[in-house]
Amino acid sequence: FISKMIDFEIFRPILESKLQIAERKSNAGRRPIDPVLMFKVMFVQRLYGLSDEQAEYQIKDRTSFRDFIGICTVDDVPDARTIWKYREELTRCGAYDELFKQFYAHLQSLGLIVNEGKIIDASFVVSPRQRNTRDENQTIKKGEGDSLWNDNPHKKCHKDIDARWTKKGGDTFYGYKNHAKVCRKTKLIMGYDTTSASVHDSKRGAELVDDNDAVGEIFWLDAGYVGTEEGFVSKSVTPVICEKGFRGRPLNEEQ
């Protein structure tokens, strides 16, 4: 269904421009992996919440994934490290925002964008735990992590200096938090904002309102966004907070 709805070739100009892919002057050597093919790998990975290793395994295991991506044989499936390197390169060259805008414009052209309300909620993205010294962790907490490991670039490229620890419901998380704006009717993602996991929901939310949202449109918000109402009202949309019950104070029928 997705491959019929979206022609992924529309992303090729952005991918080739950002990744600075030059035209091959000869057929010598191994051909580089097609950027649109790798972008489809990223799409499948994000859609199903797969790690790099899981993405490699699942694409090898599922014919439907290979058909969607355009991979003929299992031997042609990119390995986990190739997937990681491609994602890092997309991040480094700042391609994601342009790709998302292109995706949004394409959905609009298909008539899939309807301003009948949006939902904003946050979810954790877990990162591999870092093995740093106490002094290194203190430097990272001060926001000075970029000054570390400059004498060892290979080690530095494997270090995550932006992920943070947080607790929720008695569970501990290390990584990031995705704040997503979703169309209430189609459930398509209309916008996103990524922060470290330690940033509370109440510190984000209104930043996701943009010119594509209708005046007065209702925004349904998770209870974590209590206190952000003024920011939404200032942008001419209507916030509705999902109320939460507490011990001894359960929600009534009206709530």
Locate each region found by the language model.
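Polybasic low-complexity intrinsically disordered regions
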Residues: 53, 57-60, 78-235, 242-244
